[in-house]
């Protein structure tokens, strides 16, 4: 992909983000890659069939419109699934930083490489309980630990090191974070390490794979065998739970979750938001998920970003011994690329490709030129309703449980109304969702509170100052 194509793709992604909103973009478009631009066609790829089918069904016209705004001659968008590869065991040496990603093609031919581990494409008809594909690079050895992920790493390591029959400490272990912050890496590391001893059955499934497996079992009248096989697992690892759809599928997931936990089997789950924010899930499932250990992996700090960059350079050197990135370049990348770990890895891949293909050393000027589309303005902090409740409760000297209660005393009613007002103005949550998060209140109650505070801040200077102070505390 040329620099001009990279810049166009960056602008198209910006249009999509502004059109559909940050939450929708993160859920459905963040993992979409540009593969090629040919004449009147644009070739894009996503990692799963589920993402492909959902985008084609719901967002095809918007994607085409975003491209036509950039290139009016484009009349066709081809969306494919990046080929998933399965490896028998993770590579023992440092994992390769550069790996070709190609969309699925009927005419694709295998490429032999004596240094690479033997891999076989995962067949579409593979049994659901064969698990989702594992990336041999995603092990504990290649995971970079920092302040943002220390607790998540420690909890995942504790699960991986357990033995059959050991008491289960955290069940379920629920890890949530934004795109590219290491959730999938940790879950696959648990799976690799847990299966290494051969004592336990550790199964890694994406939510999409669970859904398709359950639906296929229903159609083939093998649902009972599907349930029994799942409940015979020692450690069940589920990734991208936010994509779990359908009442019957969610009900089966809830039954499986309960059966495994009640039997003392470990469940590990990852999603892009906390259980309370998974609005599409049944209340029983959210409650069960929240009953375990819920861990957030925070945004990567600069020190952690620098550690990830150094790790990726070391991995690249395993296959390209002469590859070198000066400290000044690493410092620049760590300061400038703040979005997620995938962008950091992509930056190293670009520098490696440019250095090798042009036979040039990596310099700061080259880095600034090659990664400029990855350097984004600092995004505003994402504020959560729990943060609002905590800060408001502290400001007005009440408890969070008071805000959620049915108490109608003056010292509770006003803080509750302020908190609802802030939830409406500082988050993207709907009125019904805000009401549910404030003790199961009706959306009309929330609307009344919002209008009440809106009217008061215009004429009550003291209240306006309090609200502005709360906003600053939440945004800092």
Curated annotation (Swiss-Prot):
Pfam families: Bac_DnaA (PF00308), Bac_DnaA_C (PF08299), DnaA_N (PF11638). One of its GO terms (biological process) is DNA replication initiation. GO terms for molecular function: ATP binding; ATP hydrolysis activity; DNA replication origin binding; lipid binding. Residues 1-73 are annotated as: Domain I, interacts with DnaA modulators. Residues 133-355 are annotated as: Domain III, AAA+ region. GO terms for cellular component: cytoplasm; plasma membrane. Residues 99-112 have a biased composition (Basic and acidic residues). Its main location: cytoplasm. Plays an essential role in the initiation and regulation of chromosomal replication. ATP-DnaA binds to the origin of replication (oriC) to initiate formation of the DNA replication initiation complex once per cell cycle. Binds the DnaA box (a 9 base pair repeat at the origin) and separates the double-stranded (ds)DNA. Forms a right-handed helical filament on oriC DNA; dsDNA binds to the exterior of the filament while single-stranded (ss)DNA is stabiized in the filament's interior. Belongs to the DnaA family. This is Chromosomal replication initiator protein DnaA. It comes from Bradyrhizobium sp. (strain ORS 278). The lineage of its organism: Bacteria, Pseudomonadati, Pseudomonadota, Alphaproteobacteria, Hyphomicrobiales. The gene is dnaA.
């Amino acid at each position: 992909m040329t620099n001009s194509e990279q810049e166009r793709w960056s602008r198209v992604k910006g249009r999509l983000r502004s059109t559909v909103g940050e939450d929708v973009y993160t859920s459905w478009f963040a993992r979409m890659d540009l593969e090629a631009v040919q004449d009147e066609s644009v070739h894009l790829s996503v990692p799963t069939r589920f993402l492909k089918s959902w985008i084609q069904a719901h967002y095809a016209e918007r994607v085409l419109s975003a491209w036509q705004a950039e290139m009016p001659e484009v009349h066709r968008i081809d969306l494919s699934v990046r080929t998933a590869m399965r490896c028998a065991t993770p590579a023992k040496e440092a994992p390769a930083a550069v790996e070709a990603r190609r969309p699925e093609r009927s005419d694709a031919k295998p490429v032999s490489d004596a240094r690479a581990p033997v891999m076989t494409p995962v067949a579409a008809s593979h049994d659901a309980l064969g698990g989702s594909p594992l990336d041999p690079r995603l092990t504990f050895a290649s995971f970079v630990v920092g302040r943002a992920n220390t607790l998540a790493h420690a909890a995942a390591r504790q699960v991986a090191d357990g033995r059959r029959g050991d008491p289960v400490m955290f069940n379920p272990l629920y890890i949530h974070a934004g795109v590219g912050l290491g959730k999938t890496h940790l879950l696959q590391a648990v799976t690799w390490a847990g299966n290494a001893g051969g004592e336990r059955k550790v199964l890694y499934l994406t939510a999409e794979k669970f859904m398709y497996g359950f639906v296929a079992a229903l159609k083939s009248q093998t649902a009972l065998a599907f349930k029994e096989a799942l409940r015979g697992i020692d450690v069940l690892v589920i990734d991208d739970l936010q994509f779990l759809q359908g009442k019957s599928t969610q009900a089966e997931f809830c039954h499986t979750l309960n059966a495994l936990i009640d039997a003392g089997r470990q469940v590990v789950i990852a999603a892009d938001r906390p259980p309370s924010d998974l609005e599409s899930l049944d209340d029983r499932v959210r409650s069960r998920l929240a009953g375990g250990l819920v861990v957030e992996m925070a945004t990567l700090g600069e020190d952690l970003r620098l550690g990830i960059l150094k790790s990726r350079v070391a991995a690249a050197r395993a296959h390209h011994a002469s590859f070198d990135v000066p400290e000044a370049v690493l410092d620049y990348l760590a300061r400038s690329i703040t979005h997620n770990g995938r962008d950091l890895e992509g930056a190293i891949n670009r520098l490696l490709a440019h250095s090798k293909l042009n036979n040039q050393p990596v310099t700061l000027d080259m880095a600034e030129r090659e990664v400029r589309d990855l350097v984004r303005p600092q995004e505003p902090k994402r504020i959560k309703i729990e943060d609002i409740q905590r800060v408001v409760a502290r400001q007005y000297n009440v408890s969070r449980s008071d805000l959620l209660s049915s108490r109608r005393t003056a010292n509770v009613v006003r803080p509750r109304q302020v908190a609802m007002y802030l939830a409406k103005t500082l988050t993207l949550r709907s009125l019904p969702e805000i009401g549910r998060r404030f003790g199961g209140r009706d959306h009309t109650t929330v609307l009344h509170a919002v209008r009440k505070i809106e009217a008061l801040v215009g004429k009550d200077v003291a209240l306006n100052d309090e609200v502005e102070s709360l906003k600053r505390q939440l945004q800092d």
